[in-house]
């Protein structure tokens, strides 16, 4: 290669044969299409276990081994050293279910080595979150908000938002409730506390004994309950200025915001007509 003074090599894995001469190999290495060995797509609003399942589906790693790695304190310690502004002692709070919950950014990740190590796969997702945190660093500082709290707020917005929802208004409801010392009463935190996925939270579920249960505890939960897209990050740091303290989702996905319990109850009576409709923000 040095003899041929070649350059412009493509990264990736290539299949070469013994019959190829130097010119043929150089041509292969410089002109071959850049095709990834595999890709992993992580959608918004996914919990760590769901992401582990996604990674397992595209690799030879089992979901169990992936979760073990994600919860491994030595691995987390290395991440803290490499990403000190993102991974802090906040993730080691004794009340947190999984330290890296919410820290694996939703995106499509391309990997060109079929033998990519699990650490590298996870770190690719952490790095994306770190870059986003750097982008919003000034806004977080202006709001005196840690990255961990910003991620937590963003995760609540992500889990509550529908396609038609105004995330900035949902954000304002959460901030208004916190300022009034009202519990957030957001259903996704109850489901996270229970470790369940279902369409409707029952009254008995609201009694879940967990620091994540925002019906029983005021303020934010101990940490994120899922990952969040950038739109939810942005909404978490830029809530609309409103007086809303309630909201509910109609069956068609439209979100109705109200300022008083009386208005909220009227909206419930008008729009929540059967058990398939899901009440929010009460």
Regions found by a protein language model. Name each.
Residues 1-28, 95:
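Extracytoplasmic/periplasmic/luminal assembly and interaction segments
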Residues 41, 59-61, 75-282:
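Bacterial extracytoplasmic/cell-wall-associated proteins, especially those involved in peptidoglycan
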Residues 12, 53-57, 64:
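Surface-exposed, secretory/extracytoplasmic low-complexity segments enriched in Ser/Thr/Asn/Gly/Pro
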Residues 61-71:
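Extended intrinsically disordered, low-complexity coil regions enriched in Ser, Thr, Gly, Ala
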Residues 28, 54, 69, 124, ...:
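Generic alpha-helical secondary-structure signal
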Residues 5-15, 34-36, 104-105, 244-254:
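Surface-exposed aromatic
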Residues 18-37, 43-58:
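Membrane-embedded segments
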Residues 1, 70-76:
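Short, glycine/proline-biased beta-turn/loop segments that scaffold the active-site neighborhood
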């Amino acid at each position: 290669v040095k003899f041929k003074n070649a350059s412009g090599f493509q990264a990736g894995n290539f299949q070469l044969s013994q019959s190829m001469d130097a010119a043929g190999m150089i041509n292969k290495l410089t002109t071959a299409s850049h095709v990834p060995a595999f890709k992993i797509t992580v959608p918004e609003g996914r919990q760590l276990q769901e992401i582990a399942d996604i990674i397992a589906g595209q690799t030879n790693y089992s979901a169990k081994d992936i979760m073990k790695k994600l919860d491994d304190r030595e691995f987390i310690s290395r991440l803290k050293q490499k990403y000190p502004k993102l991974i802090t002692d906040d993730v080691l709070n004794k009340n947190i279910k999984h330290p890296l919950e919410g820290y694996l950014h939703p995106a499509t990740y391309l990997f060109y080595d079929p033998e990519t190590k699990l650490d590298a796969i996870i770190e690719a997702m952490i790095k994306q979150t770190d870059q986003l945190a750097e982008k919003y660093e000034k806004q977080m500082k202006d709001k005196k908000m840690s990255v961990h709290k910003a991620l937590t707020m963003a995760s609540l917005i992500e889990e509550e938002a529908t396609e038609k929802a105004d995330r900035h208004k949902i954000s304002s409801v959460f901030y208004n409730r916190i300022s009034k010392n009202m519990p957030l009463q957001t259903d996704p935190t109850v489901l996270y506390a229970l470790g369940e996925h279902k369409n409707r939270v029952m009254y008995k579920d609201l009694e879940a004994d967990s620091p994540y249960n925002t019906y029983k505890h005021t303020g934010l939960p101990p940490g994120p309950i899922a990952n969040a897209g950038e739109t939810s990050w942005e909404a978490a740091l830029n809530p609309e200025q409103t007086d809303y303290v309630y909201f509910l989702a109609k069956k068609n996905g439209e979100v109705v915001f109200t300022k008083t319990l009386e208005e909220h109850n009227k909206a419930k009576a008008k729009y929540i007509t059967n058990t398939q409709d899901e009440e929010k923000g009460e």
